[in-house]
Amino acid sequence: MTDAPFDRADIDALLGARHPDPFACLGPHRVGDATVVRTLLPGALRVRAIAAGGGVLGELRQVDPAGCFAGALPDGQERGERPRYRLSIDWPDARQDVEDAYAFGTLLDEDALARFAAGDPRAALACLGARALDMDGVPGVRFAVWAPGASRVSVVGDFNGWDARRHPMRLRRPWGVWELFVPRIGAGERYKFALRARDGAALPLKADPCACRTEAPPRTASIVADLDALERFGWHDDAWLRARASLDLAHAPVSIYEVHPESWLRVAAEGNRSATWDELAQRLIPYAAGMGFSHVELTPIAEYPFGGSWGYQSLSPFAPSARFGPPEGFARFVEHAHAAGLGVIVDWVPAHFPDDPHGLGKFDGTALFEHADPREGWHPDWHTHVFNVGRREVGAFLIASALAWAHRYHVDGIRVDAVASMLYRDYSRAAGEWVPNVYGGRENLESIAFLKHFNDTLHGPAAPPGVATFAEESTAWPGVTAPTAEHGLGFDFKWNMGWMHDTLAYLREDPIHRRHHHDRLTFGLVYAFSERFVLPLSHDEVVHGKGSLAAKMPGDAWQRLANLRAYFGFMWAHPGKKLLFMGGEFAQWGEFAHDATPQWDLLDAPAHRGVQRLVRDLNRLHAAEPALHALDDRPAGFAWLVGDDRNNSVFAFVRRDDAGRMLVAVCNFTPVPRTDYRLGLPAPGRWAEVLNTDGAAYGGTDAGNGGAVQADEIPAHGERWSAALRLPPLATLWLRPA
């Protein structure tokens, strides 16, 4: 081989890990009539170019002692054809034969890049991140990252000694995406990106925003995921997915068991570690299914650095947390859930992200994912960055992650956290601390557009059919569950935070004072059909000094559990889908503690087993009685029978389905038994007492009506017929025409 020039300025820039265009000097280039190969391999002793069959094409001369080598290939290649050669590298302790990363052409399709820049989440899913694949028959990993403000980006990892000089990337202008194919590495490699800001300053090593696998915290590297294995995963849930696609979830029985997977089950014999996905599949899935829940909802499982955030401060929205094992483990978990008849909902946080140095903040030296103005880009309550969802690429990145959960892991629902904080520019901000919209208002127009785009995408052809979306929205924003075509946000369901706050406030009152707060239990029906609601008794209500559900109730231990049982009976009969956080189903006394577990030992006590049995029976009856769910979002499905008996703290209402089937719920929220309480009923004859939360099996006194009552033609409460009931203390009864 002949000597080949290597410009001194290029050498200095490459060695300083600040060259803006490494493909302009590295790899094969035509210089006159020769093909010159230049490479940067710090620490290499000798480099030769070899043919595919192993024959030596020639020596690359060391042109700088820091590791720059150059030489010319022999003639024989057609002009314009990519030269075919490999590099044989002698390291101090090994020899490596590998293709030259800088001999490959551009990787990403221009149309896909343009669509990503325009805000297409499918293009983000196709372009960004790390993907093990073959290029021109050569196995390796294609890396791509969006960093338009960077002056140089390198991929670093175990494969190059974390040396930012070794694998600088190509910038695809004007889209701001950097790409590189690294030959002969594959799934399982650890990596990060080394970036320099526009002024040349080196930034902290950054994890891949689109990584599909990560190290387990506190380690922070990204890992090349085996996406081919995920996409070839042996799913056996075709029947489930077909049924989901045709299910009208709004009019189906939905009862959700909310779980913090890091603490639901711990392995005490192994340092109290969290369970893996496979262990949770063996324990959580049969438990939730046996309890009669229709879905499990997982607090955020996208990788998060700080366990105390419960997952709500994620930095890797595409990657299931490595705390629970590899991504394939989560796929197996969902597969087990579907086989057991359980849907899986994941919490998703597009509102904000933490400021860990390896994360998204000032990713390329600029406010890339966040707003530059702290009045828009910093959340004062959570001390986190606010996603700039009005930037097309950021919106595409986030929605692409939601699509990934739906496609790769077959999740059945996505609950969007902190929607209210997105909708209002002045959320948790005093005057002067927020920026009005273009019309001078407080509404966040960019977030509104983003949420509509999210719902249109998840309900459109880009997503698998039947994936439901849920909004945690705590204000009276109109049209959260209205279609986007009707100027709504397009969610399938909204958490009814007002109902939860009002009813828990009522239940906290001593029964003697409840007559003065009667409206707290009835007010929810004023707006119950304005949206499609979920009634949430979530993790947020049993933490930070608020007390567990059982601890919120007044009275002695028996009265507290009786209050809770009566409340559950009221809730499961009330219009709206149901959600209960773990530990609530057996009335644990302690608050949620993310570093502990639910108080499973309480199930040794009959009273707590009784509450657990009640929740199981409520779920099964709720699923079996169409009157309790078929018209959840329609006024025709509900009517008050007794809504004004504040002196006795008694409530009664009827639920109906569109076939005329009925169920009546009667609640006595005082510890005083009511005998001969005459209740108007919408039909004559025998009514079966299908549920009594005071039943002995649930830990109650077993007071009731012997299993049935008789409705005679005695008018009461606006009905032609009525029955004389015995109302047990602090209890709810369900009656159904026999």
From Swiss-Prot:
* Pfam families per record: Alpha-amylase_C (PF02806), CBM_48 (PF02922), GlgB_N (PF22019)
Q: Which reaction(s) does its UniProt entry say it catalyses?
A: Transfers a segment of a (1->4)-alpha-D-glucan chain to a primary hydroxy group in a similar glucan chain
Q: Does the keyword Ubl conjugation apply?
A: no
Its top-level enzyme class, in one word, is transferase
MF terms in GO:
1,4-alpha-glucan branching enzyme activity; cation binding; hydrolase activity, hydrolyzing O-glycosyl compounds
Pathway as given in its UniProt record: Glycan biosynthesis; glycogen biosynthesis
Question: Which keywords describe this protein according to UniProt?
Answer: Carbohydrate metabolism, Glycogen biosynthesis, Glycogen metabolism, Glycosyltransferase, Transferase
Gene Ontology CC annotations of this record: cytosol
- SMART domains of this UniProt entry? Aamy
Q: Which GO terms describe its biological process?
A: glycogen biosynthetic process
From which domain of life does this come?
Bacteria
For this protein, the record's InterPro entries field holds: A-amylase/branching_C, Branching_enzy, GlgB, GlgB_N, GlgB_N_E_set_prok, Glyco_hydro_13_cat_dom, Glyco_hydro_13_N, Glyco_hydro_b
**Under which EC number(s) is this enzyme classified?**
2.4.1.18
- Keyword Transferase part of the UniProt annotation: yes
List, from the UniProt record, the residues annotated as the active site of this protein.
417, 472
Q: Which PANTHER family match?
A: 1,4-ALPHA-GLUCAN-BRANCHING ENZYME
Described by its record, this protein's role is as follows: Catalyzes the formation of the alpha-1,6-glucosidic linkages in glycogen by scission of a 1,4-alpha-linked oligosaccharide from growing alpha-1,4-glucan chains and the subsequent attachment of the oligosaccharide to the alpha-1,6 position.
| Protein's recorded name | 1,4-alpha-glucan branching enzyme GlgB
Q: Which organism is it from?
A: Burkholderia pseudomallei (strain K96243)
Q: Which gene encodes it?
A: glgB
